[in-house]
Curated annotation (Swiss-Prot):
Matches recorded under InterPro entries: Ribosomal_uS8, Ribosomal_uS8_CS, Ribosomal_uS8_sf
Name of the protein described by the UniProt record: Small ribosomal subunit protein uS8
A molecular function (GO) term: rRNA binding
Keywords: Ribonucleoprotein, Ribosomal protein, RNA-binding, rRNA-binding
Any one Gene Ontology BP term: translation
Xref: HAMAP family: Ribosomal_uS8_B
Amino acid sequence: MTMTDPLGDMITRIRNAQLRGKGKVVTPASKLRGWVLDVLAEEGFIRGYARVEYPGGKSDFEIELKYNEGAPVIQMIERVSTPGRRVYSSVKTMPTVHNGLGISILSTPKGIMSDVAAREQNVGGEVLCRVF
């Protein structure tokens, strides 16, 4: 069965695992998911992730979720741009998430990055998701 929104699936898996208090969550691996996980780890929303290889060429990401005194660090994670409704933002119109306490993850011509990094590099792009 093919998946129409692999990134949306990963975001939902992370959200559901955090709501259940899980320490780890597994999601199928892809380049886009890896780049988004790099940003989440860099910004301190997850502890990290590892790629797990299986025979036959299949691989998964095992994501270590982060908690602060028992409460999930990720309070809100949502998909913004979907396959049926793409959302783009220039540097001037880029929204802040909870007055700068959260981040937006963007796909730009210079790669996947947070809204803070995109403003520093003066590039806009597709708003993939918001995290707080």
